[in-house]
């Protein structure tokens, strides 16, 4: 049964959201401490440091209260919360834990210095949020949906000293949509999960491919994977190229993809999925789209063979490989190029893209590190592109709530 949203209260929900963002660290620390005190298994599942845990907590709650302030459609808001609950089943907690979890959330409100009326109304909304998430988690349990899967590494390639391409296999089909991402961890990362976009569409053998850029200790460990390693992978999440799962010229949409670094991964999965669908239907692939892949230098472009093949297969696809510099860093250690590709040097890829796509592009899809995606989104908005025509896919989970 779907939880009913509580009756409207006199509350400045926008002020609650603002207070959460302003006092994010204090709130997260308080909730973290309450979780450790009241839910003992949490000590084995989350990092001891509050700074390393629950990165998505405050942005998600702030987004929720902003939706309340805007009187957003209930179904839209609750769908996001339900997806979050289903994905968090990977931690192994039963749905009943939300009863305790919401008390931790409510206790943390004291750090926000809210008006009494706002605090009371916010607490009621948090209890509603917990019921929605508990119902979604319980429904997934009753449906027999696995909260996570164990996969084994079957292939590793390191095209340069910063990027690793890791292939895993479950041995059984893994259901997901091209462009979705997964939370992953290994025994070397106790309590730490990283979100990675699948770089290829699903296969009958349950294979997954991830492109990992080593930016910190966790991603460096994942990039250093060896064949035979076991990874734990959560449920797929997100939606890429919304409404374009069977994109063709007939749908009247011309997508323009802007990928920064390994932000190419979800775009790659989506494009290959369209090719697979066309072949399965006995048709020649013909994807109308412009694709801009941005990297610091030519050696950072690690997937040029697939990019060239996609461009060759699809006459109406325009593939642009952009670089900040024409020269590779001395210690990049990039593989020798297998094919010759033209790289364009551009200090401002968004402006270059806009110059070329003024008459064609009407859906801009941004993928990559959160800062680059946020900057690109701001440039597009400043140039007059409507917000509804921009789809952002930032790498970190907090960014998912900030940009969408």
Residue ranges and their predicted role:
Residues 1-149:
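Core of compact, soluble alpha-helical bundle domains
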Residues 19, 290-404:
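Reductase modules of NAD(P)H-dependent flavoproteins
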Residues 146-234, 255, 295-296, 323-326:
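Ferredoxin-reductase
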Residues 179, 263, 369:
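Short, conserved phosphate/pyrophosphate- and ester-handling motifs at nucleotide-, phospho-/glycolipid
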Residues 221, 266-269, 375-376:
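Phosphate- and divalent-cation-binding pockets in alpha/beta enzyme and binding domains
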Residues 236-250:
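A short, basic/flexible loop-to-alpha-helix module at the beginning of a structural domain
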Residues 257-278:
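Phosphate-binding glycine-rich loops and their immediate beta-loop-alpha structural context
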